[in-house]
Amino acid sequence: MSRRYFGTDGVRGRANATLTADLALRVGMAAGLIFQRGEYRHRVVIGKDTRLSGYMIENALVAGFTSVGMDVLLLGPVPTPAVGMLTRSMRADLGVMISASHNPFDDNGIKLFGPDGFKLSDEVEREIEELIDEDIAKRLAKPAEIGRAKRLEGVHARYIEYAKRTLPRDQTFDGIRVVVDCANGAGYKVAPEALWELGADVVSIGVEPDGMNINRDVGSTSPAALSAKVREVRADIGIALDGDADRVIIVDEKGHVVDGDQLMAVVAESFKEDGRLARSGLVATVMSNLGLERHLAGEGISLARTAVGDRYVLERMRADGYNVGGEQSGHIILSDYSTTGDGLVAALQVLAVVARRGKPVSEVCHRFDPLPQILKNVRYASGRPLEDEKVKIVIADAERRLANHGRLLIRPSGTEPVIRVMGEGDDRDLVENVVDDVIDVLQKVAA
């Protein structure tokens, strides 16, 4: 059954257009009613990134939750994984993160976490959807039972200490020069501070949010600024987070980007060496490079694949007992520590491997040669371009041409009106030609 409000990562849309204060109010009321079960006082924690619209959505959510009798703890700008962690730590019934992750500032979103700190299941989200469009006014709290809202103090210190505890107590990064790019987003305070407390020589960029510059030419989706700064200050490593700090990419001392596939290999091999890699394998999506799978097989590590989306990676990890998973885009999930992707924690694990090896990042983190992979996007205004007959024909022809030489993956984004076309194979020219042929037809149909 199609869903009206929830996508693959919560409720998301353009601020004050599809994601309005009224919708946020109703999400708060509906979610509050679903999680208000029992006679005790109910509690929700709300965090956000640095988008201008976060103020509007935060206040609307507070009104929604308190109107149905839930108390609210406001965290302010914090990484998404901090919300999962604090939902559990504060024994809250529900956690909320206001963010559109790596999207531009004029988008925003509402991610919901259960009392266990994990994102809600599809089933619970469907329950909330059904309530959003109902007449909830009949179920509002009595005047004496309206909830209260307050700001929680010391949030950043709590999260920093949590992140540091994922390392051995004697682990330091003395003598390592780190450039950290916080995307002008949720990690702009905690990431530089955590690295400094661990002894690193820290140079920070993307730490001056103004409400509209989140992810703009900085962060994990725009690594050029980080690469340039690493070379400029002769740093040992660069770390780039995205807007809500749940994903990370690394830049080596030469300014070369290390993506999530390479980072998963680094962490999985380190965990295996220490005897703590569950099931001797990891979970990644269909987007991860075939080179990763081949490399891991040579290291005695299996790779299980899922649909695209960190929630599906995590579901597979929880169902089958894996403790390492992630996406090529930099969502790295280490379930021994976190209930979601955590850019800072993943970066600390990689830094620990670098410190232990005592070698340049270019040697430590480039674990395999990826197969040529071409990824292109087509934006569309409406309709279902993939159901067009001309598109079906060109896709079938592309799959035939790549049959014995690689693979083709075409999928609509779960968070925006975009179709992603990915081709991969041993012959780069063939892959590029195949992808371009599909893109040409899609663009004509989508126009």
UniProtKB/Swiss-Prot annotation:
Keyword check for Magnesium: yes
Protein name, as recorded: Phosphoglucosamine mutase
PANTHER family: PHOSPHOGLUCOMUTASE (ALPHA-D-GLUCOSE-1,6-BISPHOSPHATE-DEPENDENT), PHOSPHOHEXOSE MUTASE
Modified residues (Phosphoserine): 101
Gene3D superfamilies in the cross-refs: Alpha-D-Glucose-1,6-Bisphosphate, subunit A, domain 3, Alpha-D-phosphohexomutase, C-terminal domain
Protein encoded by which gene: glmM
Cofactor(s) the protein needs: Mg(2+)
Enzyme class per UniProt: isomerase
GO MF annotation terms: magnesium ion binding; phosphoglucosamine mutase activity; phosphomannomutase activity
Organism listed in the record: Xanthobacter autotrophicus (strain ATCC BAA-1158 / Py2)
Gene Ontology CC entries for this record: cytosol
Positions annotated as active site in the UniProt record: 101 (phosphoserine intermediate)
PROSITE patterns referenced in this protein's UniProt entry, alphabetically: PGM_PMM
Membrane spanning stretches: none
NCBIfam families: glmM (TIGR01455), PRK10887.1 (NF008139)
Alphabetical GO biological process terms: carbohydrate metabolic process; peptidoglycan biosynthetic process; UDP-N-acetylglucosamine biosynthetic process
